[in-house]
C-alpha cells in the first residue's frame, strides 16, 4: 500500500548508499561472490539504520577450522568454486564472527542451518529444466549448452550439501545504535 521499490546495480564491496539508509537489509546468495567477506559484512551493516534488521541467506562450507577438508572434499570444493567463479565460501560460524567483529551488531548474530530445508532444491532445479525446457532452448544453442553444463555442478552441490561439506546458512542481526567507525586493518 503505497510502497515502492527500485532495483539498482551497485558494488556490494563499496555501496553507494549513505550510512544508515535502510530499515532492513536482505542479502540472498551473494556472499560467495564477494572477495573480502569482512568488507561485505561491514557494508551490509553500514547501510542499515540503528535498530534495523539484517537478514542473510547464503551458501557456506563446513567450518574447516574445526574439521579440515579431507582428501575428497578439497577437489569437490575447488570444482564448485571454479565452476561458479566464487573466490571462497565462508562457514556459518566464520561469517557470523565477521558480522560481530564490525562492532555494529546489537547483541549476538542469530544463525540457523537450513541445509535440510534447501537440499531438495538442487535436484529440483535440474528437474525444472526438463519439465519446462523453454528456459533451456530460449537462448539458442549457446544457452542450451551453458544450462546442460550446469547439471554436473548442481549434482556436486547436492552431494556437498547432503554430506555436510556445504551448508545453507541463515543470519539475523540487529544494527547497534553506534556511529560507524573506520575499518581497521
Question: Where do the PLM segments sit?
Answer:
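A short SAM/SAH-binding and catalytic strip from SAM-dependent methyltransferases
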Residues: 23-36
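A short acidic, Gly/Pro-enriched loop at the edge of an enzyme's catalytic core
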Residues: 13-25
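Conserved SAM-binding strand-loop segment of SAM-dependent methyltransferases
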Residues: 2-14
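Substrate-binding/catalytic lobe of Class I Rossmann-like enzymes that use SAM or dcSAM, i.e.
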Residues: 68-168, 174-177
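Short, charged low-complexity linker/loop segments at the C-terminal edge of domains
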Residues: 176-184
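Short, catalytically relevant binding-site loops at active-site mouths
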Residues: 14, 60-63, 86-88
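A short glycine-rich, Lys/Arg-flanked "PGG" loop and its adjoining helix->strand segment in the class I
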Residues: 38-53
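Acidic carboxylate diad motif detector
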Residues: 56-58
Amino acid at each position: 500500500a503505497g510502497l515502492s521499490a527500485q532495483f539498482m546495480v551497485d558494488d556490494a564491496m563499496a555501496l553507494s548508499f549513505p550510512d544508515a539508509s535502510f530499515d532492513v537489509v536482505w542479502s540472498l546468495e551473494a556472499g560467495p561472490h564477494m572477495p573480502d567477506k569482512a568488507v561485505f559484512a561491514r557494508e551490509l551493516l553500514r547501510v542499515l539504520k540503528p535498530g534495523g534488521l539484517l537478514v542473510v541467506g547464503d551458501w557456506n562450507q563446513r567450518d574447516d577450522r574445526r574439521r579440515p577438508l579431507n582428501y575428497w572434499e578439497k577437489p569437490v570444493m575447488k570444482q564448485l568454486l571454479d565452476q561458479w567463479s566464487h573466490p571462497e565460501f565462508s562457514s556459518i560460524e566464520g561469517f557470523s564472527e565477521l558480522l560481530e567483529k564490525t562492532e555494529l551488531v546489537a547483541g549476538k548474530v542469530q544463525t540457523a542451518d537450513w541445509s535440510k530445508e534447501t537440499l531438495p532444491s538442487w535436484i529440483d532445479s535440474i528437474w525444472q529444466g526438463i519439465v519446462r525446457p523453454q528456459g533451456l532452448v530460449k537462448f539458442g544453442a549457446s544457452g542450451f549448452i551453458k544450462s546442460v553444463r550446469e547439471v554436473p555442478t548442481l549434482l556436486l552441490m547436492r552431494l556437498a550439501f547432503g554430506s555436510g561439506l556445504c551448508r545453507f546458512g541463515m543470519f539475523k542481526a540487529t544494527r547497534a545504535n553506534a556511529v560507524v567507525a573506520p575499518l581497521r586493518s
